[in-house]
């Protein structure tokens, strides 16, 4: 069991509305922390502020970050997660909402259907760069679409391809998340730490974000290497 505050905690309106939302959910979090006698982990569903939102980090109730990298894969890259770890290395993170299977991507160069390959890339990337996991989601399920006629044409940023619950439940990406889980359990991902490329190599190379994402065991006897392409 995990307490997850809200959804899009801060909202997307700057200034006072944002401040009010952050403050209001903070009060909810403190109340949950006070009333929960079981030490249940608590987090908040971050807004999509690529790479990471900037609130709650140092607060005692905030046990781990539930990030939202969002639903367009072109900008998402390992340097986001590496930069987060350098700044907030003691606060665990999970990639909580990125590239739900079958969603309509939000990208400047046009909408695409999110494939299993796209979500697999960000899932492995997040874990290989120090994340504790990835939260899988699928269009048609989270928005409760039983029939194509259920789609609201006036509020339909993410389901432009007519994805229903029946199609989404058998999405190949869901099965592949099972492979991901078994792989990391078998290889004890908790014993691995991210391998960080040299600062200079990462900053000057135009291909830096295409480098393999690698983790190594603390005794340097094992390595897990992921190539995103």
Where are the model-predicted features located?
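Residue-level preference for long, well-ordered alpha-helices that form the structural scaffold
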Residues: 17, 21, 73, 111, ...
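Short, solvent-exposed polar/charged micro-motifs at secondary-structure junctions
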Residues: 13-15, 52-55, 105, 146, ...
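Catalytic-core region of carbohydrate-active enzymes that cleave or remodel glycosidic bonds
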Residues: 37-39, 59-152
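Generic preference for well-ordered secondary structure
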Residues: 42, 49, 77, 110, ...
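Arginine residue identity/basic-tract feature
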Residues: 18, 26, 50, 82-85, ...
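Aromatic- and carboxylate-lined catalytic core of secreted/periplasmic carbohydrate-active enzymes
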Residues: 101-103, 117-229
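Active-site neighborhood of glycoside hydrolase catalytic domains
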Residues: 1-95
């Amino acid at each position: 069991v995990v307490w997850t505050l809200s959804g899009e905690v801060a909202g997307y309106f700057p200034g006072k509305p944002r401040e009010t939302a952050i403050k209001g959910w903070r009060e909810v979090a403190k109340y949950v922390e006070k009333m929960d006698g079981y030490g249940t982990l608590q987090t908040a569903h971050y807004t999509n502020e690529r790479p990471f939102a900037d609130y709650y980090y140092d607060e005692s109730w905030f046990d781990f970050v539930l990030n939202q990298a969002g639903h367009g894969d072109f900008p998402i890259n390992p340097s986001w997660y590496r930069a987060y770890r350098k700044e907030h290395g003691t606060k665990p993170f999970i990639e909580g909402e990125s590239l739900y299977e079958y969603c309509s991507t939000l990208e400047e160069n046009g909408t695409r259907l999110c494939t299993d390959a796209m979500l697999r890339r960000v899932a492995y990337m997040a874990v290989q760069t120090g994340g504790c996991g990835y939260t899988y989601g699928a269009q048609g399920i989270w928005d409760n679409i039983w029939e194509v006629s259920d789609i609201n044409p006036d509020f339909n940023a993410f389901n432009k391809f007519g994805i229903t619950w029946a199609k989404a439940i058998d999405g190949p990406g869901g099965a592949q998340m099972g492979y991901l889980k078994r792989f990391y359990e078998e290889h004890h991902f908790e014993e691995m730490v991210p391998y960080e490329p040299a600062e200079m190599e990462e900053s000057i190379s135009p291909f830096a974000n295409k480098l393999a994402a690698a983790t190594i065991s603390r005794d340097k006897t094992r390595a897990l290497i992921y190539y995103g392409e």
